[in-house]
Curated annotation (Swiss-Prot):
Its main location: cytoplasm. This is Universal stress protein A. SUPFAM superfamilies: Adenine nucleotide alpha hydrolases-like. One of its GO terms (cellular component) is cytoplasm.
Length: 143
């Protein structure tokens, strides 16, 4: 099956390059579009008590760093990246919204095979939320 638009969900770790390379290798034969997305935690939802933190400044700084990292990842891909998207909130819902808005027919994401991922797996959440084809790439520290 030829995909038309592949969305790569990245956490901006060094392993994100592995995911982008996989997506590009799938996209090239059919000249499919490739887009990147990073979903950040909405920090204002985490702080419910009295804390003297300027969340607006922190959120702004994180957004700028995210845009910069996505731009670098896009430039390193050696492929024309269609969109570099950044969102915050629930990972599954943000991806579902992007899938609808941009006509995505394949999602590529990674799965860290470590202790914490057994307890809280983003990939498992996506399997139950996303209704397009998915490629889940196992990520190890040695890659």
């Amino acid at each position: 099956m030829a995909y038309k638009h592949i969305l790569v969900a990245v956490d901006l770790s060094p392993e994100s390059q592995v995911l982008v390379r996989k997506a590009v290798s799938m996209a090239k034969p059919d000249n499919a579009k490739v887009s990147l997305i990073h979903v950040d935690v909405n920090y204002s939802d985490l702080y419910t008590g009295l804390i003297d933190v300027n969340l607006g400044d922190m959120q702004q700084r994180i957004s700028e760093e995210t845009r910069s990292a996505l731009k670098a990842l896009s430039a390193d891909s050696a492929y024309d990246i269609q969109e570099t998207l950044s969102g915050s909130g629930d990972l599954g819902q943000v991806l579902v919204d992007a899938i609808k808005k941009y006509g995505i027919d394949m999602v590529v994401c990674g799965h860290h095979q470590d202790f914490w991922s057994k307890l809280m797996s983003s990939a498992r959440q996506l399997i139950n939320t996303v209704h397009v084809d998915m490629l889940i790439v196992p990520l190890r520290d040695d890659e």
